[in-house]
Amino acid sequence: EGFFEVAAKYYEWSGGKSFCAFDYLIQNVEYDMLASGHEPVYNDADWYDTSDPNLKASWMKFAVPLAKGHIVVSDKYANTQIMTGEVAAGVGSSAAINYYNDTVTYPDNTSEKMNLKVLPLPKTGSGEQFMPVTGTGFSAYKTTEAKAEAAAIFLRWLTEGERNLDFVVESGYMPVHDSAFEAIDGYEFPSPAHKELFSAVKTMRKEYTLTIRPEFTNYYNYVEALYPALKKLCPALQERADSGEDAALLAEETWDLFLEI
């Protein structure tokens, strides 16, 4: 709540710069739906049921500021646009913490020290909130009992309390053990930004509901078509919005694009 208002004020203050880049825009649309009390509906093609009015309602919350240029779809990962000063903020993966430079370098080759701040995901309303759990799991081939036991011992070793915290701090991942979360407050982090990240992770674990994306064969083919198409469309929409066209009508063009994916 208030996120898009801040983005609008930043756009005006900065003379037309986007406030935030989203790595996974459609996932944030989903979390808005869930927080508004609506489950996403999928079709047989592993994509969204676009006849669902709740999907469009949540999409349009993002589409209007997208059409105005207040937010953008990231260039793969938002940290790149943050490190070049293109945007002031990004919404993306916790693992991105390890891909930030110490400086922001602008297109004119001037630079300044980065003061990176990390916060929990923006919320929709005051009810139940949602967050993703994504990434890679461990698996082992069916093998001998001795090797299977060795694999299990290794996993228990890796996920033990403070060792688990050591590992996830280096990787930017989320802890998997209760004792690792309990150790966050007293842990010696490599940077203030890492400390803020894991404070945010701890807060979200307490206040947000974890969600796991359904396993769809074709889903990411749609996503990989959607984001480049949006990035191609939105600069022209931004120019038209700046020229006085109705942003709500321009946002409908992003929905038309969504329907074509």
For each predicted feature, which ranges?
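Paired acidic/hydrophobic, glycine-rich loop segments that form the ligand-binding mouth/hinge
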Residues: 88-93, 99
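Glycine-centered hinge/linker elements that transmit conformational signals in sensory
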Residues: 4-11, 43-75, 121
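Conserved C-terminal helix/tail region of periplasmic/extracytoplasmic solute-binding proteins
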Residues: 189-192, 196-261
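Short, solvent-exposed loop/beta-turn-alpha elements that line the ligand-binding surface or hinge
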Residues: 38-57, 105-110, 123-129, 188-189
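Active-site-proximal beta-strand/loop segments in catalytic clefts of secreted hydrolases
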Residues: 23-25, 93-94, 119-124
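Extracytoplasmic/periplasmic substrate-recognition and gating elements
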Residues: 67-68, 106-179
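Extracytoplasmic/periplasmic solute-binding protein
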Residues: 2-47, 87
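Short helices/loops that flank or line small-molecule/ion binding pockets
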Residues: 5-9, 76-90, 232-235
